[in-house]
Curated annotation (Swiss-Prot):
Family of this protein: Belongs to the arenaviridae GPC protein family.
Organism ancestry: Viruses, Riboviria, Orthornavirae, Negarnaviricota, Polyploviricotina
Gene Ontology annotations for the cellular component aspect, listed alphabetically: host cell endoplasmic reticulum membrane; host cell Golgi membrane; host cell plasma membrane; membrane; viral envelope; virion membrane
Binding site residues for Zn(2+) 2: 453, 455, 461
Cross-referenced Pfam families: Arena_glycoprot (PF00798)
Organism expressing this protein natively: Mopeia virus (MOPV)
Gene that specifies this protein: GPC
GO annotation, biological process: fusion of virus membrane with host endosome membrane; receptor-mediated endocytosis of virus by host cell; virion attachment to host cell
Name of the protein in question: Pre-glycoprotein polyprotein GP complex
Residues engaged in binding Zn(2+) 1: 57, 465, 473, 475
Site entry (Important for GP-C-mediated membrane fusion), positions: 33
Lipid-conjugated positions (N-myristoyl glycine): 2
Glycan attachment positions: 78, 88, 98, 108, 118, 166, 222, 363, 371, 388, 393
Spans traversing the lipid bilayer: 18-33, 431-451
Topology Cytoplasmic: residue spans: 34-58, 452-489
Length: 489
């Protein structure tokens, strides 16, 4: 009994200690909150800006996302697919293997005097390089409704390939008058393969683009491969875009079944733990760059990014070399069948049209991405657009960079939420929901002030007596019935 009395005597001292602890805790919280408010109110950012403005630039966006870029070296792809490039607006090249290629020249000088092309005879006598000729055949078969054979001349003396197409659209009137001719079709195919300003659209008649040029001939010849490409880097995209348009009616599915599958990693990242790495042979100025499964998984979910197309091409090239050990001709035959599983031809055509319209476009050679300095995760690289032959300045697409940073932050929050949900017991979540609901209901009940007893109007509180609706109490203290009452809390 004495212990109980002692305990109750110490209660005021205990309460004083608790109050001291509460005051100390609240003081610490207030100081921390004040420091946070000062850090986020903008004054420190303003002071930093005023101190560094005009002296230093930063590649950090949204405080945590660092801006990087990479340049792809597509010269290694020539083992399995033709690469095209331009020396200038009139001289264009296709590289096949490491030593040979085709030169496509827009010129006003004819090199073949006759007007016929006996291709079947050359094929029967095996006069030409089959790999080169298959590329030429792809170009020729892409010309719509070719039936004017006088528009084409060829010569295969001693294995030398010489093909000459006649062009006749030097001005707006000629282009309009000959819009449906073979020459217009030749120029349209050439314009789709090489993003060149030497050919321009003069008009559009019933959906057919009428193309004009100052040149009279398109000449295709085989050539030894040198360092021709000064105007543009070697790229397979032009030739592959022709292939995809020719074959899309026959290969409807975008996934090549059988020998190769083009899933870079599955949704959980089991195929390639750590993502996908670009090696020295694929990059310019870098030895190695890896992208995690978070970025690469987006390539498997959708077929709508230029960088994903390039990864598929590099992956195709690597697997073809390691598994097939094929010669050039066999590789070209394989890429003919696989093209629709590798690239999105709609993306290629969209970028081509953007170039023709003078809008910044993607040339598939340079990409930018963001790196999260906290987690080390990277975004899926996006194409660094080109206009007037040069890459855009970083400030010209800063809005897209900010949006990508926002997307990465949102994706991080979503993943953290999913992770938290997966590690939290379901019963604990139910208990939290019940306790929160109970608390909100109790607050509501407290706010509505439910009455607890009756008063006689104009009289003081009758407690501890409990009046009934007749204003009387069974103890007899209130015994005058019929007085007006009201509920009170």
């Amino acid at each position: 009994m004495g212990q109980i009395v002692t305990f109750f005597q110490e209660v005021p001292h205990i309460l004083e200690e608790v109050m001291n602890i509460v005051l100390m805790t609240l003081s610490i919280l207030a100081i921390l909150k004040g420091i946070y408010n000062v850090m986020t109110c903008g004054i420190i950012g303003l002071i930093t800006f005023l101190f560094l403005c005009g002296r230093s630039c930063s590649s950090i966006y949204k405080d945590n996302y660092e801006f990087f870029s990479l340049d792809l070296d597509m010269s290694s792809l020539n083992a399995t697919m033709p690469l095209s490039c331009s020396k200038n607006n009139s001289h264009h090249y296709i590289q096949v293997g490491n030593e040979t290629g085709l030169e496509l020249t827009l010129t006003n000088t004819s090199i073949i005097n006759h007007k016929f092309c006996n291709l079947s005879d050359a094929h029967r006598r095996n006069l030409y390089d089959k790999a080169l000729m298959s590329i030429l055949t792809t170009f020729h078969l892409s010309i719509p409704d070719f039936n004017q054979y006088e528009a084409m001349s060829c010569d295969f003396n001693g294995g030398k390939i010489s093909v000459q197409y006649n062009l006749s659209h030097s001005n707006y009137v000629d282009a309009g008058n000959h819009c449906g001719t073979i020459a217009n079709g030749i120029m349209d195919v050439f314009r789709r393969m090489y993003w060149s300003t030497s050919l321009s659209v003069a008009s559009d008649i019933s959906g057919t683009q009428c193309i004009q040029t100052d040149y009279k001939y398109l000449i295709i010849q085989n050539t030894s491969w040198e360092d021709h490409c000064m105007f543009s880097r070697p790229s397979p995209m032009g030739f592959l875009s022709l292939l995809s348009q020719r074959t899309r009616n026959f290969y409807i599915s975008r996934r090549l079944l059988g020998l190769f599958t083009w899933t870079l990693s599955d949704s959980e990242g089991n195929d390639m733990p750590g993502g996908y790495c670009l090696t020295r042979s694929m990059l310019i100025g870098l030895d190695l760059k890896c992208f995690g499964n978070t970025a690469i998984a987006k390539c498997n979910q959708a077929h709508d990014e230029e960088f994903c197309d390039m990864l598929r091409l590099f992956d195709f090239n690597k697997q073809a070399i390691s598994k097939l050990r094929s010669e050039v001709q066999q590789s070209i035959n394989l890429i003919n069948k696989a093209v629709n599983a590798l690239i999105n031809d709609q993306l290629v055509m969209r970028n081509h049209l953007r170039d023709l319209m003078g809008i910044p476009y993607c040339n598939y050679s340079k990409f930018w991405y963001l790196n999260d300095t906290r987690t080390g995760r990277t975004s899926l690289p996006k194409c660094w657009l080109v206009t007037n032959g040069s890459y855009l300045n970083e400030t010209q697409f800063s809005t897209e960079i900010e949006q990508e940073a926002n997307n990465m932050f949102t994706d991080m929050l979503r993943k953290e939420y999913e992770k938290r949900q997966s590690t939290t017991p379901l019963g604990l979540v139910d208990l939290f929901v019940f306790s929160t609901s109970f608390y909100l209901i109790s607050v509501f009940l407290h706010l509505i002030k439910i009455p607890t007893h009756r008063h006689i109007k104009g009289k003081p509180c009758p407690k501890p007596h409990r009046l009934n609706h007749m204003a009387i109490c069974s103890c007899g203290f209130y015994k005058q019935p019929g007085l007006p009452t009201q509920w009170k809390r």
